[in-house]
């Protein structure tokens, strides 16, 4: 990134510091990536200072920052989702689980932000009760676990669908599928995402039309009707059930690693489109998606998603980047004291390959992955396999 941009140090959870930096550098437009600044009102802070920014307000961001708000909102506006129960105490949660109303498996979600780790799919009562203890009694996620949403388990295939909204209109950005579990074969604990591919082969034109009409349109209209017009990226996490697509979750941002596989497929002047959304006017904007496929593989630090190692030198990036169709998206990286690039987070980077089909994109992605080395590096070796079936 340093080759094409000025990298500025910034505490991402401080709206005042972000606004001060935008003013200092004369930013024409700020695009918010993570959910934490949105939850703390960075868009409201910028707007009050007359600074252009793309993202939902703090109130609109509740679609992601509060599972209880999102479920109640969907109920109010007829958006299809799983049946649910909200518990405000561990005792109530245990009592509801014991009632057997939803049976097992059952899904438990911490109400607030938990870095993608606040969801437990419990196959039995013992696992469900352990999740209640962890979230509500042991306070694993702090205040995010003040409430727990218990959801009826939905059976089907998952996909993610993305749009950009100006508060009234939307521009579709297509679909993707991600791999949340840490190990091959979707084994192990959930993570923020170990890889993704786009577009989803499940999302044909008919399904896309239903998603836009039955899910996206009611959400955008509902937010506007409730006084919180939604501007920015909306990520719809969906389950394709026999009864149709149902919402599992919303993200009020593009999502990671989904953004990395969708962005390389967007053709045209993306900057103009983003500026139009931020200004509340997408009337003359549309997006053309390339007739290609992408596969993105996350390189994770040893120990992730639990306690992980950092400060490990990274090698092989130049060789990986020379492979046709490869883009390297940095995440948890930093410059060490000796000027070498080192690991600085759980998910270190995403290697994205574009190809004519999924097989070519997958082959290129893993060819590039095998060029990169750092101590303890962990990758899944099956990212994209689902698209080949």
Tell what function each PLM region has.
Residues 1-58:
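ATP-binding N-terminal substructure of ATP-dependent carboxylate-amine bond-forming enzymes
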Residues 7-13, 85-89, 122:
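Short acidic-hydrophobic, aromatic-tinged amphipathic segments that line or gate anion-handling sites
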Residues 212-234, 251-323, 336:
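Active-site "cap" helix and flanking loop/linker of ATP-utilizing ligase/carboxylase catalytic domains
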Residues 333-338, 342-389:
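Generic C-terminus detector
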């Amino acid at each position: 990134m340093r080759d094409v941009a000025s990298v500025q140090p910034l505490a991402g959870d401080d709206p005042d510091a972000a606004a001060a930096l935008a003013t200092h550098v004369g930013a024409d437009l700020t695009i918010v990536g993570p959910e934490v600044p949105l939850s703390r009102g960075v868009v409201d802070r910028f707007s009050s200072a007359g600074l252009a920014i793309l993202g939902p307000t703090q109130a609109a961001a509740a679609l992601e920052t509060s599972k209880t708000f999102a479920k109640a909102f969907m109920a109010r506006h007829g958006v299809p989702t799983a049946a649910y129960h909200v518990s405000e105490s561990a005792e109530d949660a245990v009592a509801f689980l014991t009632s057997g109303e939803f049976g097992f498996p059952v899904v438990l979600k911490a109400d607030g932000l938990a870095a993608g780790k606040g969801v437990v799919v419990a196959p039995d009562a013992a696992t469900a009760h352990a999740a209640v203890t962890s979230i509500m009694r042991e306070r694993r996620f702090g205040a995010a676990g003040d409430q727990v949403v218990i959801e009826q388990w939905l059976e089907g295939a998952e996909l993610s669908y993305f749009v950009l909204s100006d508060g009234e209109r939307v521009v579709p950005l297509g679909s993707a599928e991600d791999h949340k579990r840490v190990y091959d074969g979707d084994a192990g604990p959930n993570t923020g995402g170990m890889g993704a591919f786009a577009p989803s082969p499940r999302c044909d034109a008919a399904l896309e039309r239903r998603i836009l009409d039955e899910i996206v349109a009611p959400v955008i209209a509902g937010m506007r009707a409730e006084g919180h017009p939604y501007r920015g990226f909306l990520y719809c996490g969906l389950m394709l059930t026999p009864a149709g697509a149902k919402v599992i979750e919303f993200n009020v941002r593009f999502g990671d690693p989904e953004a990395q596989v969708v962005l390389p497929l967007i053709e045209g002047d993306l900057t103009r489109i983003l500026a139009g959304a931020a200004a509340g006017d997408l009337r003359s904007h549309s997006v053309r998606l390339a007739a290609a496929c992408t596969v993105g593989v996350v390189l994770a630090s040893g120990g992730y998603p639990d306690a992980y190692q950092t400060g490990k030198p990274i090698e092989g990036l130049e060789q990986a980047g020379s492979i046709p169709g490869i883009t390297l998206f940095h995440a948890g990286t930093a410059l060490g004291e000796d000027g070498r690039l080192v690991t600085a987070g759980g998910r270190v980077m995403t290697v994205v390959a574009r190809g004519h089909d999924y097989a070519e994109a997958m082959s290129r992605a893993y060819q590039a992955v095998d060029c990169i080395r750092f101590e303890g590096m962990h990758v899944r070796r099956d990212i994209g396999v689902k698209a080949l079936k």
